[in-house]
Amino acid sequence: MPEVIARTGRVQSWIDDPTSRLPVSCTVFVVEDSMEGPEGIEASWRFVSHALRYGAGCAVHLSKIRGRGHENGKGLTASGPISFGKIYSTLNETLRRGGIYKNGAVVLHMDLDHPDVLEFINTPRHELPWVKRCVNLTHEMWEDSTHKEELLEGIKRGDIWLNKIRYDPYGNRIYGNVCLEVYLPSRGTCLLQHVNLGACELEDIPAAFYKGMSELCKLHSRTGVGDTGEYLPSKTDRQVGLGMLGLANLLRRYKVTYKDFGLTLEDYINGGHGYSKAYLIVQALAQGIRDAAKVATANNMVRAFAIAPTASCSYRSVDLEGYTCTPEIAPPIARTVDRDSDTFGVQTYEYGDVEIASEVGWDDYKRVADGIMTLLSRTGLAHGYSFNSWSDIVTYNEEFIEQWLDSPQTSLYYSLQVMGNVQDKSDAYAALDEAEVDDYLNNLFNENDLNCNCQE
C-alpha cells in the first residue's frame, strides 16, 4: 500500500540525521528601519544566511525600511529597501553555489503602499536575479494605489506575486513566507507535511488527516529550532502546515470531474446534502479537516493547514494504482512529466488518465480551490494556498485582482501556461528544494531570465 502521508524532504532528512539541515520548510524576517539592532538590516543578513545554510526558504519583509531619498533629520539619506535587495540576492547565489544542498530560496516582500513599491515592481530581473518579489496588499491599498497598471504588468511578466496582508486574532500582523502558503511572525518557522489523497480510499481520508496532523504536532515539539538563537522557540511559535496532494488522482479513481467536485463543494458549503461519489469525497475531506483541526487545537496550534506547492513530494508519492501523484490540488498541465536531474538523468513520471488543466478550465479549477480553502478557513486554523493563475486563460486586469481579493484565496503565486505544448507545472515551479534538480537549475540560470523559488 502506498503511503497516505507525504513527508517533505526536509522532514525526512532531519528524521534520518538530526544533525543535518533543520526540518522546517520556511521562515520569515521582518526588517526594522535600522542598520543595527537584533531586528535590523545587518541582523537580517545573518538570519538569511542561517536559513539558507540549514535548508529553509526565507521571506524578507522590507516595508519598514524608509524609502529612497528619505532624510532622517540627522544628515543621513536613506538608500531605500531595493538597494539592500541586491545583498539578499547575492547571499542566495553564493550560499547555493557553495552549500551542500544547493536549494536556497529567498523572496522579498513589500507592501503596496510603500513609497518605493514602483521601483520594487519595475526593477529588472537581472538586478535581483536570485530572489523573487511579492507585493502585499489589502482591499484599501488596492483601491488607493496609483500603480495598478504597473502591478498588473509585473504579474503578467511573472516578476511579481501577490499576498494578502493578514493579522492574527490578537491584532498582530503575520507575514507571508517564500511560497506564500504560510503566515508567520518574524523569525517564526513552519513544518510542512501533506496528505496523499491519491493513496486513500474514501474511508481512509479522515484517518489520513488525523495521522498527518498528529505527526506534525508531535514533531513540532522535538525540532529544537529555537536553540539556534535565530528562530522563535517552539513553545511560543505555534504553527504547523498540513496540506494535500494527489487530488486529481483521487478524482480519477472515483470518476469524478473537477467540475462536479467543485459544484458539490459549493453546495456542501451552502448546507446541501447528497449521496453521489462527489458528495462522498467532499464529506470525507471535510471530516478529515475537522478531525485534524481537533488535533491541532489540542496541541495549541494557532495555524495548522497550508496547501504548499508539492512537486518534489509528488514525485516520491504514488496512488493506489501505482501512478505518480499530482502536485497539490490543481489539475496538472500534462499527464506525463519528464524530470531531468543531475543525479538520476531523465525520469518520466505518469499521472495516469487524470483530468488536465486545459480540460478542466479556469472557472472549475477556481471553484474547487475556493471550496477547499473555505473548508480550511472555517477551522480558524488556515494559513493559505500557493494559488497559481493560468496566464494563457485569465485576463490580468483590475476586475481579476478585485475578484481575487474577494475570494478565500490568500496568494497569487506563479502565472502558468496550461494550454497546448508548454512546460510542465513542476518545471515552472523551478523546484529548488531537491539537489536532484541541479541540471534543470544550471540550464535555467544560464538564461537571461532567472527564476528562483522554493517548493516541495
Model regions: which residues?
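Long, C-terminal-biased catalytic regions of enzyme "large/alpha" subunits
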Residues: M1-E456
